Swiss-Prot record:
Organism for this UniProt entry: Rattus norvegicus (Rat)
Database matches in CDD domains: Rrp6p_like_exo (cd06147)
Protein name (Swiss-Prot/TrEMBL): Exosome complex component 10
Biological process, per Gene Ontology: CUT catabolic process; DNA repair; exonucleolytic trimming to generate mature 3'-end of 5.8S rRNA from tricistronic rRNA transcript (SSU-rRNA, 5.8S rRNA, LSU-rRNA); histone mRNA catabolic process; maturation of 5.8S rRNA; negative regulation of telomere maintenance via telomerase; nuclear mRNA surveillance; nuclear polyadenylation-dependent antisense transcript catabolic process
Compositionally biased intervals (Basic and acidic residues): 1-10, 217-230, 732-756, 776-794
Record keywords, A-Z: Cytoplasm, DNA damage, DNA repair, Exonuclease, Exosome, Hydrolase, Isopeptide bond, Magnesium, Metal-binding, Nonsense-mediated mRNA decay, Nuclease, Nucleus, Phosphoprotein, RNA-binding, rRNA processing, Ubl conjugation
Amino acid sequence: MAPPSPREHQSAPATGATKPDAEMVLPGFPDADSFVKFALGSVVAVTKASGGLPQVGDEYDFYRSFPAFQAFCETQGDRLLQCMSRVMQYHGCRSNIKDRSKVTELEDKFDLLVDTNDVILERVGILLDEASGVNKHQQPVLPAGLQVPKTIVSSWNRKAGEYGKKAKAETFRLLHAKNILRPQLRFREKIDNSNTPFLPKIFVKPNARKPLPQALSKERRERPQDRPEDLDVPPALADFIHQQRAQQVEQDVFAHPYQYELDHFTPPPSVLQRPQPQLYRPVEETPCHVVSSLDELVELNEKLLGCQEFAVDLEHHSYRSFLGLTCLMQISTRTEDFIVDTLELRSDMYILNESLTDPAIVKVFHGADSDIEWLQKDFGLYVVNMFDTHQAARLLNLARHSLDHLLRLYCGVESNKQYQLADWRIRPLPEEMLNYARDDTHYLLYIYDRMRLELWERGNDQPVQLQVVWQRSRDICLKKFVKPIFTDESYLELYRKQKKHLNSQQLTAFQLLFAWRDKTARREDESYGYVLPNHMMLKIAEELPKEPQGIIACCNPVPPLVRQQINEMHLLIQQAREMPLLKSETAAGVKKSGPLPSAERLENDLFGPHDCSHAPPDNYPVTSTDGTMPLQKQPSLFDEGKEETSVDARCLLATAVITLFSEPSTEEAGKTPLTVAQKKAQSIMESFENPFRMFLPSLENKAHISQAAKFDPSSKIYEISNRWKLASQVQKEPKEAAKKKVAEQTAAREETKEESTAAVLEQPIPVRQQAALENATKKRERATSDLRTIEQKQEKKRLKSSKKAKDPDPPGKDFSPYDYSQSDFGAFAGDSKSKPSSQFDPNKVAPSGKKCFGAKKFKQSVGNKSMSFPAGKSDRGFRHNWPKR
């Protein structure tokens, strides 16, 4: 029953002449058809052999009772499982089919077998499609030279064959020295990580057009500040003097030391002309010097003072320091390259201020936004007359603005970014890292020449574009380093970025952990990412573990400082768990942004978001010049009026109001004359005709139109134009007369009031007379009101009497009372023999077994209608029915 071997199949006479092994598709088979036939025969033979085994049931149990059969089955089963595992492993599937527990052994093995079959059959289908031409290999659309390079997300990514230059893959690794001696320990000056604003380190100001403030001088820093308490002055005056001095010192200290020089800087005329690009020297022919001593640094400064331009770049490290460390400075001239060890010369780097602040020397940077701040933070260095190639690339609208792209575009050099994430604190530096740092500035001056030429040509042979780049570079030089300041609400900024909602306990834990991380990072001089990364801190705040082991479980890998101070963190978590569990509204309360104003239609020509002339003047308080305190419009000693509530300035009324066509009030019409625009508007309003009052007969002249005139067009026009008038025209005269009368009355009242007030002012009246006058006026008003009410009542009585006189009562008829003796009262008695109602009555009392003979028998009909209604059908409409039992 064993299947034939490939050798037997090959030696069979049916195969014919055999081909060489090199031409065979598979070893021992000349073509695919022969292999398929052989495999199919093997599968059929195996299927027949498996069918000859004892079936599951009594027969199999009987054979299983023999030890030889049991051992044979186990041996062959293991062999089959091993073969199946090899096939699974070959196709990349899970191959641990033998390592299964006894409980779910059969189900797990069957699931693995099904998954493997699916993978194999899917792969077979793909290969068959490719062989038949349905699915072909997809070739890249772009040529090799235009392929987008792979982005290096982190140091362990692989970069294979970039731009077809390197066929062999290169592995990028983060060169981080774990056991390196911290360079902060060798610094002469201790790093200031305190929670205070940054104090500039400069104490000598070369190339100064405005002297350095005395507060920044070295003598002033070394000597203690003289307090006014030492003087013979009162304590209050001493505090005032100290506040004034501190305010002036604060303004001088936190200002940019070269603010005046940069504001009055103009590029030299030589750099605003058409440049002649000077080609860079080959790297092999250019000398490279490593500056690591004070004498070499002084010599470098002298060489830089004799140059017209030089390129500068920095290498920074921020993972093992709170504020970061500038580890290396690369400087390149037209003929030499210099690499300055800034960790060794940290306290002496101020010497380079003489060349960096010289306005006659051009300093070429690329992306100097961070470099300017690092120079200020670590060395107290400032830059004047800088050209940033990154800003030039943005102005030229290049495809990319990186230095790598500029090197490829202008120099044809492929930069090696293998050491981009290296730890630059390593000493001594390897040769590869030195070459990498050198390449960043070696070609930068040639790129500077080429970009200036393109800017000159783009500006039509005018230095307009060049001046824009120098202006942007000057703005970058004006940047100041700002130290991160911790406040009680600093955690909210990070909390809003996470887009996760935390309750009161979780938010308290997040706040406490954020404060602990900031304090630990400042004390240990480590970065936030080294002490406790953001995602780990948020995970701990969400979980609120009860045990220290839970905190460690939330961190993978566990930061060293977390493992070292796990007990302190556990106490913070316990403190947060003691808080009441509420919904957090802290983050929402901090954002005090009011509701957005309603969007105004842009097609409105009169809309202006900053036009508040139409708003009433009393809506908003008048603010002071500095915008801090609202000013009172009419100051008074005793203000009895209501306090004006301050309205938020964001509630700006932006709706245009046209008051030209509004009718003036009767009181204002007599006072102020109409303007020319208002007169024109009034004439326009009078010319408008009301369509609801047109073609009405006149109220005064009730003309009769003949029926014959309707058919005559001339007479019809005549009748309409002469005898029919608008009702509005008839009503114009009485309205105008009424307005004039009201205006005259108001004017007369005001005149009498003015005369009375003038008389009172001229002749002062005593208090008793004033009270008597007030009582007299009140009595007059009451009397007049009583007379009016009496007259109104009398008029009503007259009207009633007149109506009665006009409508006499009709003659009365003979009245005959109704005879109730003939009526039938049976409708109100009810039917005593009525059947019990089929409807359920909730008021009915269930009959009890005992009978009360002494009481009177009173049977109330259940379900009958009320006695006040007849027995017939009611016309009330819907009737509520009780539910049936």
